[in-house]
Amino acid sequence: MGKTNVSHKLYITLLAGGMGKRMQSNLPKVLHKVNGETMIVRLMKQVIKLNPDKILVVVGKFYSEISSEIKQHINDNRIEFVVQKEPLGTGDAVKCTLPLLINDNIDNIILNGDVPMIQHSTIKNIYNYYLETKSKLLITSIHLSNPTGCGRIILDENFGFSEIIEEKDCTEDQKKLTLVNCGIYVCNSKILKQSIPQISNNNSQKEYYLTDLVKIYNNEPSNNINLFILPRNKEIEIYNINTKEQLEYIESVSK
């Protein structure tokens, strides 16, 4: 992917520090294999095709195992590993990367490490839309026939983005909405450095959620948040794997 925006650097951040408890395995979640290849390596191979300036891989207690797996299959000096010392949530994971954002002209694509089916062309389309709309923060969404378990996207009266509401906080009417958050964000480094430190852990899990970045920045008077809606046929690409059953499903449809 040639640099569409020559004045801005492009960083891609992969959140791979999750414990993956629901996998019921001693193996880190992103090291589970989809048809013979680990999730993280599959994802890395797609990300590299975007020709970013840097790839930040946020890891936790399994730093050694995950970094070893990546280095075994991919030799690229643009990869940097960022250690999240405690599993305090996705917002904290991104906070760990802030010291590496050395200036305000870095575009950051942030995505989870457990979406092994995503294609570089899809990520490229998301980033191009971010550039075309001159966004400061872009949220990726999709309509799902079964949105159970996903955060819902709330639109304003002009059908623009309003907020993300996690399912547990949704009213019965909001649960009927099918437009959901994909967990893929594009954001300017200046916004990250301003907003991420404001995220609190005032929730039942005592974790710092990346979705709170949206709430915080949405309160800024000059915010420029845009929404990119993926076509429905991309559902398999943004499918998060959290359980063995989900892993088996992805393997069955990707052969």
Curated annotation (Swiss-Prot):
<keyword id="KW-0808">Transferase</keyword>
<dbReference type="GO" id="GO:0006048">
    <property type="term" value="P:UDP-N-acetylglucosamine biosynthetic process"/>
</dbReference>
<dbReference type="InterPro" id="IPR029044">
    <property type="entry name" value="Nucleotide-diphossugar_trans"/>
</dbReference>
<dbReference type="GO" id="GO:0003977">
    <property type="term" value="F:UDP-N-acetylglucosamine diphosphorylase activity"/>
</dbReference>
<comment type="pathway">
    <text>Nucleotide-sugar biosynthesis; UDP-N-acetyl-alpha-D-glucosamine biosynthesis; UDP-N-acetyl-alpha-D-glucosamine from N-acetyl-alpha-D-glucosamine 1-phosphate: step 1/1.</text>
</comment>
<dbReference type="Pfam" id="PF00483">
    <property type="entry name" value="NTP_transferase"/>
</dbReference>
<keyword id="KW-0548">Nucleotidyltransferase</keyword>
<dbReference type="InterPro" id="IPR050065">
    <property type="entry name" value="GlmU-like"/>
</dbReference>
<protein>
    <recommendedName>
        <fullName>Probable UDP-N-acetylglucosamine pyrophosphorylase</fullName>
        <ecNumber>2.7.7.23</ecNumber>
    </recommendedName>
</protein>
<dbReference type="InterPro" id="IPR005835">
    <property type="entry name" value="NTP_transferase_dom"/>
</dbReference>
